[in-house]
Amino acid sequence: MAIDYEVIDRIKKAGLVGLGGGGFPTYAKWQDGAEIIIANGAECEPLLIKDQFIMENYPSEIINGLKLAMTSTGAKKGIVTLKEKYKKSILSIERQIKDSNIAIIKLPDFYPAGDEFILVEHVTGRRVPVGGFPTQIGVIVNNVETIYFASLVERGEAFTHKFISVIGQVKKSGVYKVPIGTRFEDILNNAVLLDKPYRLFKDGLMMGKNADLTDAVEKTTSAIFALPIEVSNIVNSSIPIDIIKRRARSACEKCMFCTDLCPRYLSGYPIEPHRIIRGFSLSVDENVDEKIIAMAYNCSECGICEIYACPMWLSPRQVNRYIKMAFKKPDVSLGINNKSDYFNERKLPISRLINRLFINEFKTDVKFISEIEPDRVELPLRGYAGAILKPLVKNADSVRMGQVIASNDDTSGKIYNNVCSPFHGKILSVKDRIVIERI
């Protein structure tokens, strides 16, 4: 396959990353080539709408970006995947497809339809290896927003802005386009918070994190949620791990619902959340069995086990997350099984998940609200795949729009990443964030 390294180098220098949540640099996925490119528009988290907005309103950029990915990697097939209920998006994309090697595949409305392991098998029939990546089987999966911005980078634009969904207790819920580094406070001032108690989340209700007004938009930020307190406690209880361990030891009913509904388990991957949480809760001095640790590494952290499946409100997902942070992945071979006969019957419909989370009232139409251009941005230096970024500017420096202001050293083989200024400005501060004021 012919790989266009010049295009891939432009993608690298632009700092484009996976915008579906992973944040893995796009160039690193593209540089080894592929046979199939999947533009993932499943947008499976409840209430999110920004990917649908992009597909409805920028279909030519998506198809051009998909073609760019194909020619850059040598791929012979391009596929746009999106849910069959996204009627407007499907119509917009179909009108732009002129080539026989590009197709649309429509997905059923379940969570998590966008999981790469599940998506790749559904679309291609190929199975991602245990603990592996789609690139190992000749498939690259990019979020549709990544594909959109790839087309802009090829036109010479820097990757400095992104789209986000703003949902919940706000007067103007919908899609916003903002510079990377925009403070949540500035966004919510535009969206107009209602005068009610709320708690903030970012990125997703199932896989996202707690947030506050001082947070700033990162490359991977996909959404801001302002939820009522009573709802937010269901979505993300943020329980300390020692309490989770004690609760599991005393309250686990051994019902196996967490495993029975686990999408990765149903897909045949070696993970059994009920065994992991039991083994961890009964371990002494964190002497956890290696097989338990190895299984935890197959968790996608989708959250079904703790938010939907467990009748005792235990937290297998948080246990898996903790194990992956606290323990090195062991050299234990776990085989892959056939997909469960119950895979289709146990898919979790989004409508049922929304009802369980008590968030029906916050569903909103796919609509663009505004482009926000604040006078100041705060660009984080942490949280990037590869390494902590090192600033390339100092206090009082003037910077131009698109200028690389921080990057990491990729000469040692590390994954390269950078961040660019979203406008002409002056550096006010260089600490854990680079603060830029517009001039």
Question: Where are the language model's segments positioned?
Answer:
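Extended boundary segments
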Residues: 126-129, 143, 333-370, 434-437
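Ferredoxin-type iron-sulfur electron-transfer modules in oxidoreductases and energy-metabolism complexes
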Residues: 227-249, 259, 264-341, 374, ...
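Short beta-strand-turn/beta-hairpin segments enriched in glycine/proline and small hydrophobics
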Residues: 365-387, 407-421
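Hydrophobic alpha-helical positions that pack around
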Residues: 76-186, 190-195, 204-205, 228
